[in-house]
A protein has these predicted regions:
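Alpha-helical linker/hinge and terminal dimerization helices associated
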Residues: 65, 96-107
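C-terminal regulatory/oligomerization modules of transcriptional regulators
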Residues: 102-163
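Short aromatic/hydrophobic contact patches that present stacked aromatics
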Residues: 47, 83-85, 117
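N-terminal leader segment of winged-helix/HTH proteins
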Residues: 1-19, 65, 156-163
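Basic, amphipathic "hinge/linker" alpha-helix immediately C-terminal to the N-terminal HTH DNA-binding motif
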Residues: 23, 75-97
């Protein structure tokens, strides 16, 4: 019988961890609206057309994860309500949303084209998400990438190999 080769444990995965957080229905759309400046609970519910109980759960998850902060406000003569703002960790998801949007624009938009376009507010140029290595080489989506263990990797032994 041969030795037991080590394999990376795929249960410890940054993609899986991130999808646990943002992969729930409505979560990406809530984040989209927060990026676009919709902050108040009632406005989010109306803009998204989402059930209030679902929105409450999604926002609570985002607050608990540190992606969003919740702040009370009160209009004169009204009861206290809440508004939500992205944290630095929440803002770090912007490239993810833009990449999802770019995929939809390229592969799912109707014949008339994308419904919205993003422009850099300072110069008016279109906003894109690029895949590149640390040396600045631009990569296309089919570029070969090597997967190697990172500092947080865990290993498991694979099944014994018969001779």
């Amino acid at each position: 019988m041969a030795t037991h080769p080590r394999e990376l444990d795929s249960t410890v995965c940054s993609i899986a961890r991130t999808m646990e957080l943002i992969g729930q229905p409505w979560t990406m759309l809530v984040l989209r609206d927060l990026f676009n400046g919709v902050r108040r609970f009632d406005e989010l519910a109306e803009h998204l057309g989402i059930a209030r109980n679902v929105l409450t759960r999604r926002l609570a998850t985002l607050v608990d994860a540190g992606l969003v902060t919740r702040r009370s406000y009160r209009e004169p003569g009204q009861r206290a309500r809440h508004e939500y703002r992205l944290t630095q960790a929440g803002h770090a998801l912007r490239p993810v949303l833009i990449a999802v949007m770019a995929y939809g624009d390229e592969h799912l938009a109707g014949p008339e084209g994308p419904p919205v376009q993003l422009e850099h507010a300072d110069c008016g140029a279109p906003v894109t998400v690029r895949l590149e290595c640390a040396e600045g080489h631009r990569l296309d989506p089919t570029a070969r990438l090597r997967v190697r263990p990172g500092p947080g990797a865990r290993f498991r032994w694979s099944e014994p190999v018969s001779d």
